[in-house]
């Protein structure tokens, strides 16, 4: 009887010892895992992020994701040259003759008029041999009449281009665009003291036509 009691006590002791060993092993494993997390916290975060990212990617996929990946088209933006960027105005927006004008010039603009003139001979007046009429299409000259009172003819400066007439005196300034192209070298000017008027006659540049030359 005593031997049986001894055997049962020995078995209880062995069971308790084995349970203690298992508990100690579990505790040691848990301690090692906790220590590993303390030493390498980023590994766990990376694994969690990878799982979350994978789930979000899978959830965002739809029927449009089936097939080859789409290639994004690149839009080409035309480059503007530095010269164009530095321009304040477009050359087409600048009025003709603006390069001759001076906005700071305070001289007065004189009275003037531009008229068309024909070269008419006796054959045109009495015989009517040509087909000329009174229209501007049959005129061959432009005449500019400019009022310049109290002006010395020697003080008058004139610059005539194909489409520009530029006149300057100490008191007056005139810059006009001519209605027709003219021959610069054909211009003739004379001052009429009685009327204090300057007349400038210019031959127009026109193609040969039957009305003017036949």
Curated annotation (Swiss-Prot):
GO terms for cellular component: cytoplasm; trans-Golgi network. One of its GO terms (biological process) is axonemal dynein complex assembly. The keyword RNA-binding does not apply. Disulfide bonds: none annotated. Expressed in testis, small intestine, prostate, adrenal gland, spleen, lung, bladder, breast and ovary. Expressed in ciliated epithelial cells. Its main location: cytoplasm. It holds the Pfam family PIH1_CS. Transmembrane segments: none annotated. Keywords: Ciliopathy, Cytoplasm, Disease variant, Golgi apparatus, Kartagener syndrome, Primary ciliary dyskinesia. It is linked to Ciliary dyskinesia, primary, 36, X-linked: A form of primary ciliary dyskinesia, a disorder characterized by abnormalities of motile cilia. Respiratory infections leading to chronic inflammation and bronchiectasis are recurrent, due to defects in the respiratory cilia. Some patients exhibit randomization of left-right body asymmetry and situs inversus. Primary ciliary dyskinesia associated with situs inversus is referred to as Kartagener syndrome. CILD36 inheritance is X-linked recessive. About half of CILD36 patients have laterality defects due to ciliary dysfunction at the embryonic node. Belongs to the PIH1 family. This is Dynein axonemal assembly factor 6. It comes from Homo sapiens. The gene is DNAAF6.
